[in-house]
C-alpha cells in the first residue's frame, strides 16, 4: 500500500526547497571568502555570481508565484528579476550572501503560504 503523505503539495514543495537551500548553504560555507571571486573559465560565473543567481531566481519565483496575477511572461526575464532582487544589492561578499541565503528561503515560504486572498 502506498505511503500516505501528510503534507500538502505546497508544503512538500516548500520542504524540498528548504532542503535544497540548506545543501547550497552548506556548500557555500565550505568555500573560503577568498575564493568567492573564483571563475573556473572565462565564460563561467564566479562562486559569488552563481550564489547570487540562485538567490535572484528564488526571490523572483516567490514574488511572482505569490501574486494574485502571476504572469512569468509579463516582462523580459532581466526586468522580471529586477522587480524582486533589491536585497541582492547589499550581498557583495561571502558573509552577506550567506545571510541572504539563510533568510530569503523563510521569506519566500511566508509569501507562498499566505492565502490567495491576502496576496
Give the positions of each predicted feature:
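Short, well-ordered coil loops that connect the C-terminus of an alpha-helix to the N-terminus
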Residues: 33-34, 114
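Helix-turn-helix
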Residues: 47
